[in-house]
């Protein structure tokens, strides 16, 4: 066995370090360079449902039909040439300290102290002790079919310049203790067919300047004379 080992030639193992050191000295191969292309990226095109958060200093122009509701105490200074046309039927509820300048044709509903015009067929029945004191120059024209039934103790004191024009077919039935005190220059002209039935204790005190127009050809029938003629 020893003789066999001595006959084999000794071959040293290859040194890889020396081979690696020699590689930089060799010239690089002359091959065509092919760049590696990646998938196209589109960062500026938002996908559906993407939310874009604007950075500081970004100006966004609102589209047509955008509605902006200012907070309380918010002051908005419109630019020059800015025109806002409200749509028909638009209702604006201003906040505290907000000024509204109505446009031509604007209708404003007045607050307390406005004048109310009663409709036809109105019936006014005042209670006991109810006083109506009209102002100077006040004219009351009752409509057709209006019935006024004053209660007991109802005083009517017309002011100077007060004119009352009763309509045809108006019936006034005063209660007990009803007093009518006309003022100077008060003129009462009864219409045709007007019936006045005074109650018991009804005094009529005409004042100076009071004019009473009687109907033509009044007929007075006493019960005593008619019974004697029939006998």
UniProtKB/Swiss-Prot annotation:
It is found in: Cytoplasm. The keyword Cytoplasm applies. The modification N-acetylserine is found at residue 2. One of its GO terms (biological process) is keratinization. Sequence repeats lie at residues 55-62, 63-70, 71-78, 79-86, 87-94, 95-102, 103-110, 111-118, 119-126, 127-134, 135-142, 143-150, 151-158, 159-166, 167-174, 175-182, 183-190, 191-198, 199-206, 207-214, 215-222. Keywords: Acetylation, Cytoplasm, Keratinization, Repeat. Transmembrane segments: none annotated. GO terms for cellular component: cytoplasm. This is Small proline-rich protein 3. It comes from Oryctolagus cuniculus (Rabbit).
């Amino acid at each position: 066995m020893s003789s066999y080992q001595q006959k084999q030639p000794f071959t040293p193992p290859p040194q890889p370090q020396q081979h690696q050191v020699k590689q930089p000295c060799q010239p690089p191969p002359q091959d065509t360079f092919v760049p590696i292309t990646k998938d196209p990226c589109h960062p500026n095109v938002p996908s559906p449902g993407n939310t874009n958060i604007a950075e500081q200093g970004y100006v966004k122009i609102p589209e047509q039909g955008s509605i902006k509701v200012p907070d309380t105490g918010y002051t908005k200074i419109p630019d020059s040439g800015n025109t806002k046309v409200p749509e028909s039927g638009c209702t604006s509820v201003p906040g505290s300290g907000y000024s509204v300048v109505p446009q031509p044709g604007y209708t404003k509903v007045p607050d307390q102290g406005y004048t109310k015009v009663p409709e036809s067929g109105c019936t006014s029945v005042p209670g006991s002790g109810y006083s109506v004191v009209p102002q100077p120059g006040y004219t009351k024209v009752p409509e057709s079919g209006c019935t006024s039934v004053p209660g007991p103790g109802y005083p009517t004191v017309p002011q100077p310049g007060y004119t009352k024009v009763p309509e045809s077919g108006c019936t006034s039935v005063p209660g007990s203790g009803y007093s009518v005190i006309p003022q100077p220059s008060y003129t009462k002209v009864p219409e045709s067919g007007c019936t006045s039935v005074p109650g018991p204790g009804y005094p009529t005190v005409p004042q100076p300047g009071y004019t009473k127009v009687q109907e033509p050809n009044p007929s007075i029938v006493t019960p005593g004379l008619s019974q004697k003629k029939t006998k």
